């Protein structure tokens, strides 16, 4: 009798502990859902809170429910929790450029937080488009870069694709955190040839353009991609872009990406405590450069880690100079970064013009070490929140 009672008490205690743990986890995740940006440019201009003021969160696990939760252009506060993988095509293959344009571009309204639950927040076969809005948060998501079913041909440039995994277009106060963007199941070695040229079906991973401003990209992972992040889409768009396109990158990982991490026109970029992994001789994604300086673009790099195999001298410059590609700008400064484990001052010999901005936000760039680089690599991307 006593043993039975003891077992009963033990079972009840175990159940109580399980229930308590579940409630604590639910409570903790609810707190994450309402997080506001606390770092970088997204803290400015009134801050970035997404859907924090929503009365309750909505769970979705298919494209129909996702569109319903977004509710078109409705700008009331909303938190959308992605609990299962979402195929934006709805399982119906795109048949043409017009069909893909009509069905694959999902517009996100103002005052929205989209957050994945655990490792379930996955999007394939489409793009998340933040256009003409403000105050949007994307967290704990995996987005596979879309495959263009009808690339266009440009004389002298070959086949070119449309569609990016995510787009920030003429929007302000955007926070992208713990997001992974990757070519995933369709890597560039699967390209075919058409009319004797490579049939390119990927465009960018993330575009930030047309006067967008106050953006922070943190703890995210960009992997297995060629033209990764473009900030400022055209040399002729200075009237809209000048003084804007202010973006902070920190604690991100760029793993086997060929270029544009990022490439910037007109904007002011602050990149600290990021990790760059690549190989000039990689068979699919050969490393070209990390930072691209386009027209009137400027970059401040602090305490980043570059582990890059087979770097070579270009135009007689130090091999490390290939990290920064000068298009129509030379405004760049670095301090405290490591290149292949060693502190580098050699970027100062690359014909660059020092960039020393006065930043309006507080931040702490940790001293880069191999252990810190490992920690950043282990904690960036979706499923790590």
Swiss-Prot record:
Signal peptide start-end: 1-30
Cell location: Secreted
Top-level lineage group: Bacteria
UniProt xrefs under SMART domains: Amb_all
Cofactor note text: Binds 1 Ca(2+) ion per subunit.
Primary subcellular site in the record, as a coarse category: secreted
The entry's keywords: Calcium, Lyase, Metal-binding, Repeat, Secreted, Signal
BP-aspect Gene Ontology terms: pectin catabolic process
GO MF term set: metal ion binding; pectate lyase activity
Top-level enzyme category: lyase
Spans of repeat Sequence: 177-182, 213-218
Active site as annotated: 260
GO cellular component, one term: extracellular region
Cofactor dependence: Ca(2+)
Enzyme Commission number, as recorded: 4.2.2.2
Family matches, as Pfam families: Pectate_lyase_4
Residues noted as binding Ca(2+) in the record, renumbered to the chain: 164, 207
Catalysis: reaction(s): Eliminative cleavage of (1->4)-alpha-D-galacturonan to give oligosaccharides with 4-deoxy-alpha-D-galact-4-enuronosyl groups at their non-reducing ends
Region (2 X 6 AA approximate repeats): 177-218
Pathway(s) per entry: Glycan metabolism; pectin degradation; 2-dehydro-3-deoxy-D-gluconate from pectin: step 2/5
Biological function: Involved in maceration and soft-rotting of plant tissue.
Similarity comment: Belongs to the polysaccharide lyase 1 family. PLBC subfamily.
Additional facts recorded: Pectate lyases have been implicated as pathogenicity factors which induce maceration or rotting of plant tissue. PelE is sufficient to induce these effects under laboratory conditions.
The name this protein goes by in its record: Pectate lyase E
Organism from which the protein derives: Dickeya chrysanthemi (Pectobacterium chrysanthemi)
Lineage: Bacteria, Pseudomonadati, Pseudomonadota, Gammaproteobacteria, Enterobacterales
This protein's encoding gene: pelE
């Amino acid at each position: 009798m006593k043993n039975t009672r003891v077992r009963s008490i033990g079972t009840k205690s175990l159940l109580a502990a399980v229930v308590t743990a579940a409630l604590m986890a639910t409570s903790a995740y609810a707190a994450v859902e309402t997080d506001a940006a606390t770092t970088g440019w997204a803290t400015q201009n009134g801050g970035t809170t997404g859907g924090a003021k929503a009365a309750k969160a909505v769970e979705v696990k298919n494209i129909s429910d996702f569109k319903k939760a977004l509710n078109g252009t409705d700008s009331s506060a909303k938190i959308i929790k992605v609990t299962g993988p979402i195929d934006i095509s709805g399982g119906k293959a795109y048949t043409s450029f017009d069909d893909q344009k009509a069905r694959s571009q999902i517009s996100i309204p103002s005052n929205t937080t989209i957050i994945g639950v655990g490792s379930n927040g996955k999007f394939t076969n489409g793009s998340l488009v933040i256009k003409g809005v403000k105050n949007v948060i994307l967290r704990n998501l995996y987005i596979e870069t879309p495959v263009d079913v009808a690339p266009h041909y440009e004389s002298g440039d070959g086949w070119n694709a449309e569609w990016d995994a995510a787009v920030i277009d003429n929007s302000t106060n955007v926070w992208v955190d713990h997001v992974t963007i990757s070519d995933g199941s369709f890597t560039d070695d699967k390209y075919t040839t058409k009319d004797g040229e490579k049939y390119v079906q990927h465009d960018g991973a993330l575009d930030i353009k047309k006067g967008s401003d106050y953006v922070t990209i943190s703890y995210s992972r960009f992997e297995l991609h060629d033209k990764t992040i473009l900030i400022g889409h055209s040399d002729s768009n200075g009237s809209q872009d000048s003084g804007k396109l202010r973006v902070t990158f920190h604690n991100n990982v760029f793993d086997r990406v060929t270029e544009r991490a990022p490439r910037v026109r007109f904007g002011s970029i602050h990149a600290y405590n990021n990790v760059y992994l690549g190989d000039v001789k990689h068979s699919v994604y050969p490393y070209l450069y990390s930072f691209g300086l386009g027209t009137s673009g400027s970059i401040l790099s602090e305490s980043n880690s570059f582990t890059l195999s087979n770097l070579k001298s270009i135009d007689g410059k130090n091999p490390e100079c290939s990290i920064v590609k000068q298009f129509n700008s030379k405004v760049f400064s670095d301090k405290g970064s490591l290149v292949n484990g060693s502190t580098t001052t050699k970027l100062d010999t690359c014909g660059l013009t020092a960039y020393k901005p006065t930043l309006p936000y507080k931040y702490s760039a940790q001293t880069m070490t191999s252990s810190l680089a490992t920690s950043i690599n282990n904690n960036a991307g979706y499923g790590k929140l």
